[in-house]
Amino acid sequence: MKNIYQGKSVLFCLTAIAASVGVSVATADNARPMLEEIIITSEKREASVQDTSIAITAIGSEQLKDLNIFSQQDIANFTPNMSYQESAGGGEGNRIYMRGIGRETSSTGTDPGVGVYNNGFYTTESGVLSGSFDRIARVEVLRGPQGTMYGRNTTGGAINVVAKKPGDEMENVVRLRKGNYDLTNADITSSGPINERVGYLVHYSKTEQDSFFTNVSGADPKGTDSDYIEAQLDVDFTDSINWNMRYFSASFDNETLERNKLDGYRNEVGAPSKLGALVINPELFSPLATAPTDPFEISSDMVGFVAVDDQHTYQSTLTIDTGAMQIKILNGYQDYSWYGEKDFDGTASPVSYVEKIGQAETNKQHEIQFISNTDGDISWVAGLFYYNVELNQPYTLTDANNPYLINNGTVPNPDGIFYTQRGILDSTSKAAYGQVDWQASDKLTMSLGLRYSEDEKEGSETQLQVYDAVVDYCTEAALPYVQGYGAYFDPALVSPAFAGCRFGMV
């Protein structure tokens, strides 16, 4: 199956916004250090958070440290109208919502409703929100549509994760952190000038932690293990031309517990199959009469995981100040792959269904921004945006313990695959946007914005399901048919079927 999708849209907006609607963790109150005012760039130019006319939460590096904010969930806890949905055990289904708008599915070809920007570069991965305050200058969360200020997917809002730049003075920092469940975290940062026009920053972090859960039927989950490395070079060619080059790479190997059963097993002979009647109900053979009642205990025959490897990101930002306006030229490239396995049946049964999913992705983006540099009541921003992503996502369901899947008489199937699919996508987005702001008074700012966007998606999906085999099915008396294509069996007849029949279907 091959689908090509093209879409064009134009967005026009006129708003009158009171400056007081900007909400932030940062305020002008100097009585408490964690509430000091911070400078943001959410509207493409530097401004005090109190002078910004949009609904925003801004958390600087000092607040990140003082409030012990380390994860996406921590940021959501401090941000009004923002929620974060995390898969159990740190799986691959993590999603951000703003005012009820977010990503409803992670299926290939879908896009989130909240745009995440890593140092000005668009990304679909929420993981960039978590990290050390030694490398993150601030996190800016903008609530509400931002399409006339950003290049892509900001219907619900936009999140800017702004990286720290090389400092003017030499600084070397080593931080060690220990915690429950044998948590060990190390952050090493070095930053400073090489000469009067060139600065550098390098950062490395390592985090390990045991699982919160105990497996009563096998090996315990593996917990978390992650690495991150970053290098920056910042060059001032002249007083008005700056070039920032940034590289970072991340990897992790974490547990995932997405299919853990919380209710009792259906292990009577006539129990319905969890997957319809496609394959045997694994709960029938579960060694436990009931699932664990302790929320920190699981019963599984395998240790699930999700891992990212070979992730490399390159970012280049050239800034030219002409006096009347500032021009920014952004070029980025990223490639990475991730892979995960999890217990699909949620039991410790010898009938073991395993879900295997992976993704290899390459994306590149280019953007040019024009930002007014005047001090009057009128300011403006305009930009051109280009983004291309190519991804390949395989997905399989297997039962390597089932001899009738492995020896089905049709095709070699050593992994016991009973379902497989592969999605391939090539997506290109182009956009032109602009916004003019008129500060009518200290309390009122009026904005006029225009946006044009064009999306083209070309994708294909292949699915393979084996229904027929060389060997015969059992007789209808032992294996009744169900209306529709293919043959299915009744789980109530599993025992006699295994005793006297060979199955050539899945």
What are these regions (language model features)?
Residues 69, 195-197, 236-240, 322-325, ...:
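Outer-membrane beta-barrel channels and translocator barrels
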Residues 172-174, 200-202, 243-245, 327-329, ...:
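Transmembrane beta-strands of outer-membrane beta-barrel proteins
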Residues 1-67, 73-77, 191, 239-240, ...:
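N-terminal Sec signal peptide and the immediately downstream disordered periplasmic leader
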Residues 111-113, 125, 134-143, 148-215, ...:
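Outer-membrane beta-barrel translocator/receptor signature
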Residues 160, 168-169, 177, 188-286, ...:
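Periplasmic-side early beta-strands and strand-to-turn transitions of outer-membrane beta-barrels
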Residues 32-169:
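Acidic, small-polar-rich N-terminal luminal/periplasmic segments of exported/outer-membrane proteins
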Residues 216-217, 381, 386-506:
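Signature of Gram-negative outer-membrane beta-barrel scaffolds
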Residues 118-120, 143, 192, 233-235, ...:
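Residue-level signature of outer-membrane beta-barrel architecture
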